[in-house]
Regions:
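Amphipathic repeat-derived elements
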Residues: 18, 36-48, 78, 95-97, ...
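A structure-centric signal for secondary-structure junctions around beta-strands
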Residues: 13, 28, 43-44, 56, ...
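Conserved AdoMet/S-adenosylmethionine-binding subsite of the radical SAM
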Residues: 86-236
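Flexible, acidic/Gly-rich N-terminal and inter-domain linker regions that tether
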Residues: 1-45, 49, 57
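Short, flexible active-site-adjacent loop segments at beta-strand->alpha-helix junctions, enriched
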Residues: 22, 35-37, 53, 108, ...
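Canonical Radical SAM [4Fe-4S] cluster-binding loop centered on the CxxxCxxC motif
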Residues: 35-87
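Surface-exposed beta-strand edges and their flanking turn/coil or helix-capping segments
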Residues: 32-33, 42-46, 62-64, 75-77, ...
Length: 236
């Protein structure tokens, strides 16, 4: 890994642009070392890692897919981002930190990279810390491999991150299916399918699933439709 550029925000964190390429082939990814606003990093440490070079989805509000899709990252390439951030913080210990969140949500769609699942298992082994929280953010693509991928993700959550130590986020962006299609321009689960999966996902003690929305200018969220589709017992 070669760091190409580092950008810092005082009191918040650092964004790294890294080249994972070999033999002259450039493979650029971003990852972030940060904290939750208003919470000291000593209490909550947040790492955001990439799962792909670029992204094949092309969401309207995201620039990760602007240069196209450059391939999936390996387990070692994903965990390498975590290890790099750990080395940059010698006064902090991933294994002893009271709360450290590793969010697979920077560049790429995690469910389109099969290596994300073994990376999650490897992370739990490498950082055996009850304060470790793993997180995935997804647009829920509709492909033949995604449904079994999510079922396996349930098993990873139950086996490696029980007791509320896993956070699953769905990037929906609209409660209107037609409008959502313009924001996330790929085939994907319908809203009712996301809701049904959420019911299967939840076990006692689990974190609620998070719904993310990024409406554009002049676009309004239909709160009533969201509440009608998504049970607040399972979603927030």
């Amino acid at each position: 890994m070669r760091i190409v550029e580092t950008r810092t925000a005082k009191g918040l964190g650092a964004l790294y642009l890294a080249d994972l390429g070999t033999r002259g082939r450039e493979r650029l990814v971003e990852f972030v070392d940060t904290r939750e606003p208003g919470v000291p990093k000593s209490r909550k440490w947040v790492l955001m890692v990439s799962t792909q070079v670029g992204c094949a989805v092309g969401c309207r509000m995201c620039d990760a897919g602007a240069a196209g899709f450059g391939g999936n990252l390996s387990v070692d390439e994903m965990l390498g981002q975590v290890r790099f951030v750990a080395r940059r913080n010698p006064g902090m210990d991933l294994r002893r930190h009271p709360k450290v969140k590793v969010h697979f949500a920077r560049m790429g769609e995690p469910s389109l990279n099969p290596a994300v699942l073994p990376a999650l298992r490897a992370l739990a082994r490498e950082v055996p810390n009850p304060g470790l929280i793993a997180s995935i953010s997804t647009v829920a693509p509709r492909t033949p491999v995604v449904e079994p991928w999510f079922e396996e993700l349930r098993r990873v959550k139950d086996e490696c991150y029980p007791g509320g130590r896993f956070q699953l986020q769905f990037s929906l962006h609209s409660a209107d299916e037609a409008l959502r299609g313009g924001i996330v321009p790929i085939r994907k689960w319908r809203l009712d399918e996301v809701a049904a999966f959420g019911r299967r996902w939840m076990r006692s003690g689990d974190r609620k699933l998070t719904l993310n929305f990024a409406p554009g200018p002049g676009e309004r969220l239909d709160d009533a439709a969201i509440s009608r589709i998504f049970d607040p017992e399972h979603f927030l």
